[in-house]
A protein has these predicted regions:
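Interhelical loop and adjacent transmembrane-helix boundary motif
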Residues: 214-262
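Transmembrane alpha-helices
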Residues: 157-158, 180-216
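Amphipathic cytosolic juxtamembrane alpha-helices at the membrane-cytosol interface
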Residues: 4, 81, 85, 89, ...
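Generic hydrophobic transmembrane alpha-helix motif, especially the helices
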Residues: 106-147
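Cytoplasmic-entry segments and transmembrane alpha-helices of multi-pass inner-membrane transporters
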Residues: 8-9, 81-120
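Hydrophobic positions within alpha-helical transmembrane segments of bacterial inner-membrane proteins
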Residues: 20, 67, 71, 75-83, ...
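Periplasmic/extracellular loop-to-transmembrane helix junction in inner-membrane transport proteins
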Residues: 2-10, 30-74, 94-95, 241-252
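N-terminal signal-anchor transmembrane alpha helix
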Residues: 14-31
């Protein structure tokens, strides 16, 4: 009983530390960001289309739009591929192929974001610049690399959800005359829908919060993009690019951007 009580105390302490960390982050963000937002004006801050710190003009609407567009592009690129890969690994791949691909997915998850950004800078940006409109550093380049970066999250969570579906569901579908593909997509996938959706949501959170790779390839123009070939600046990129030299209201506006980003992720 003493060991059990000690274990419970340890688990409770770990949970308390996690809760305290989240609470402290919230307190820091809101205590420093909300006053700046109030001073600027909520409407001017959220819907303003100009970001000019030198003139004390802080409108983050272009960054909000940029974050939404980049995340939407990442979802379009990464979610279908990740979902189909998860289905293949869970229900179609043999043991050898499945193990090899699973190791590859784990490797993707461990690659630093700066390496992804360097890859996009060396591959995607020149390709877009030489074959498509624009200068290469664009919303399209950011969306492509973000789509690749969310693949491990989507694949891993979706595969776990598919693996957790009881075998009797699949066997029952076969007993009713369905073939393998129909049993998988008609019975197993719907049964795992909540877990697959969780993987997609986690992938979206990863895309919204990603910074370094986006900074390297997005162009970082603080304007609303006119097309996928235009440069774009996300909220995270805005914070990283300017926090090093920001002061006073400028610094508060950047922390306020963090508040908006925090609400987005929630």
């Amino acid at each position: 009983q003493a060991k059990e009580g000690l274990a419970r105390a340890g688990f409770a302490a770990a949970a308390g530390i996690c809760i305290l960390a989240v609470a402290l982050i919230c307190v820091f963000l809101f205590a420093n960001g909300v006053p700046a937002i109030s001073e600027i004006g909520v409407v001017d801050f959220l819907l303003g289309t100009k970001w000019k710190p030198g003139n004390d003009i802080y409108g983050i609407f272009p960054m909000i739009v940029g974050s939404i567009y980049a995340t939407a592009g990442a979802v379009i690129v990464g979610v279908p591929s990740g979902f189909l890969c998860a289905v293949f690994l869970s229900r179609f791949a043999g043991k050898g192929v499945g193990r090899f691909l699973s190791n590859g997915v784990e490797l993707l998850a461990g690659i630093p974001s700066v390496v992804y950004g360097f890859f996009a800078l060396m591959v995607f940006v020149p390709f877009i610049r030489n074959n498509l409109p624009g200068k290469g550093m664009s919303l399209l380049a950011a969306s492509l690399i973000l789509g690749i970066m969310i693949l491990p999250t989507v694949i891993t969570v979706a595969k776990s959800a598919l693996d957790a579906v009881p075998k009797r569901y699949y066997e029952g579908a076969l007993a009713l005359g369905g073939d393998h593909e129909r049993a998988v997509f008609g019975v197993v996938v719907p049964a795992a829908a909540s877990g697959i959706l969780a993987g997609i949501v986690l992938g979206i959170g990863r895309a919204i919060g990603e910074t370094m790779a986006v900074v390297m390839v997005a162009g970082n123009n603080a304007v609303i993009p006119e097309s996928i070939f235009s440069g774009v600046r996300t909220m995270t990129a805005n914070i990283v690019l300017e926090m090093g030299y920001a002061a006073d209201l400028h610094r508060g506006a950047l922390i306020g951007t963090g508040v908006v980003l925090f609400v987005f992720i929630l």
